[in-house]
Amino acid sequence: MSFTPANRAYPYTRLRRNRRDDFSRRLVRENVLTVDDLILPVFVLDGVNQRESIPSMPGVERLSIDQLLIEAEEWVALGIPALALFPVTPLEKKSLDAAEAYNPEGIAQRATRALRERFPELGIITDVALDPFTTHGQDGILDDDGYVLNDVSIDVLVRQALSHAEAGAQVVAPSDMMDGRIGAIREALESAGHTNVRIMAYSAKYASAYYGPFRDAVGSASNLGKGNKATYQMDPANSDEALHEVAADLAEGADMVMVKPGMPYLYIVRRVKDEFRAPTFVYQVSGEYAMHMGAIQNGWLAESVILESLTAFKRAGADGILTYFAKQAAEQLRRGR
């Protein structure tokens, strides 16, 4: 859409007029961030009464399920509509075939049941991916040459997604980037009677260096070692490819799509929203959080940068944001910034 201003010449047009007072700035504000836009990712540990700090993500902790329920009381009271669960798998439960991913008594499955029972109004989004469960840290099953096998991996992902739906997850979020996994998961959910379980597809997930602290948090960094995920996650240099990925996922039955990472990919968010007009989400990933929080803690940036960064996602076209700042943002919004 082109924009051609007509007869808007200074001094008759003074764009600062509407900026003069707070009330007029509020009246003409184009994008508004609310707590309804926020999804809080959380890391869940095995055990009882466990809390572990994550050095690369200051202020974020891994929590056992009992501690998660305690913290969730405050998150729900703040109005945060949904949590995204990421399990921290003990080393002894990791394997080449990622069988723990679909264990009905796995961490994610038990956490989902506990949260749904305590907070039935809270949205629970579960991660469908194999990297927390494999000994090599990749998102799929490997062949003898170390290449991730697409269709074999999908079979495991389907079993994982079904186990999450059976535990009560309202949204499953495949983050693996295997071709065709959305269609396979949708078909399996329909066949099992989970017709209202939504799929939030990590459609445009880039092979990014911004994920480092997350891999520390879930304990997959040491398993992955010097490996990378370039054979299935997207090349950061590509833009058009994101549209092909989103189109495929929507055609296969995704209810929502996601762009990840966030701030370095705002233009991708805009392109996806303009092209498809589908529910579009964005992930302010661990590296983005670590940079912002580090700067805030050192006094280099004001805490107001949290809402500014999240508003940028809304301006780019995002309908919702996964952010480790969800609690702080909700508190700031409640205070009126």
Predicted regions and their residues:
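Alpha/beta enzyme core
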Residues: 2-4, 9, 21, 34-39, ...
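N-terminal intrinsically disordered, cationic/polar leader segments
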Residues: 11-14, 29, 35
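Acidic, Ser/Thr/Pro-rich intrinsically disordered transcriptional activation regions
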Residues: 16, 20-24
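N-terminal leader/domain-start detector
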Residues: 20, 28-31
